[in-house]
């Protein structure tokens, strides 16, 4: 089972998609539903994923889960902003080892909710798992866009922030008004993550990964260390 491997829900479909994109890329270009879902479906799946994340935010969740969620979310956000600003100040727009400051911010401020739930359920307690109600805000690009705009490293149009916020709010209000919807989203999250990861891997191949070189390895390690 994919759950037996930490992060397997992301790693396994990603590896499969990258291998297919490298050796038989035409499988994603059949057209129709296949191309729409497995190759062009990333934006749609991300919108769905944001609704799911929003539904996980429980306004009744107080105490230790709220405390842990706020601390982890705030720490990741501040760490990403500080690292991005320092690298930008010292190395300039070109960044460190070819890694631009805004890329570092995106890698550090974001998180993987599915991986967190998997690990916290296995090794943590109920309060650790409950913290996802706040940490899920970090799964999408919302905080990343705010960080990039706040640091001045990117000019983020207000429409982009609204486009991210709307599905989050839809999920938030619907999930708090209807517990059944939240439960359905909780079940759907791994499925959405699975297909979203495939569409990401379908646009990548082994040659791209290899040409990333040292900068790609460093970025991957930084992202993994701060996940």
Each model region followed by its residue ranges:
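Interfacial loop-to-helix junctions that mark the boundaries of transmembrane helices
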Residues: 2-6, 28-42, 70-71, 101-104, ...
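Entry/N-cap segments of selected transmembrane alpha helices
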Residues: 36-39, 57-88, 140, 204-227
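Hydrophobic transmembrane alpha-helices of secondary-active transporters
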Residues: 14-26, 35-68, 167-179, 187-212
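Cytoplasmic-side transmembrane-helix entry/capping segments in multi-pass membrane proteins
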Residues: 5-12, 64-78, 127-136, 162, ...
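Loop-centered beta-sheet repeat module
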Residues: 128-175
């Amino acid at each position: 089972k994919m759950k037996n491997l930490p992060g397997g829900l992301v790693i396994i479909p990603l590896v499969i998609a990258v291998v297919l994109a490298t050796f038989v890329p035409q499988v994603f270009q059949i057209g129709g539903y296949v191309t729409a879902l497995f190759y062009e479906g990333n934006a749609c799946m991300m919108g769905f994923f944001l609704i799911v994340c929003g539904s996980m935010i429980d306004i009744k969740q107080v105490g230790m889960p709220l405390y842990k969620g706020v601390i982890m979310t705030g720490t990741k956000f501040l760490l990403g902003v500080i690292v991005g600003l320092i690298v930008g100040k010292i190395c300039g727009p070109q960044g460190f080892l070819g890694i631009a400051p805004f890329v570092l911010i995106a890698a550090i401020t974001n998180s993987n909710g599915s991986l967190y739930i998997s690990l916290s359920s296995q090794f943590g307690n109920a309060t650790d798992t409950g913290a996802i109600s706040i940490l899920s805000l970090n799964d999408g690009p919302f905080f990343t866009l705010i960080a990039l705009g706040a640091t001045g490293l990117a000019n983020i149009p207000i429409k982009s922030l609204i486009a991210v916020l709307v599905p989050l709010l839809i999920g938030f209000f619907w999930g708090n008004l209807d517990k059944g919807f939240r439960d359905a989203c909780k079940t759907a999250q791994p499925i959405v993550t699975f297909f979203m990861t495939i569409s990401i891997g379908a646009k990548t191949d082994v040659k791209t990964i290899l040409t990333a070189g040292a900068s790609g390895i460093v970025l991957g390690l930084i992202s993994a260390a701060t996940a």
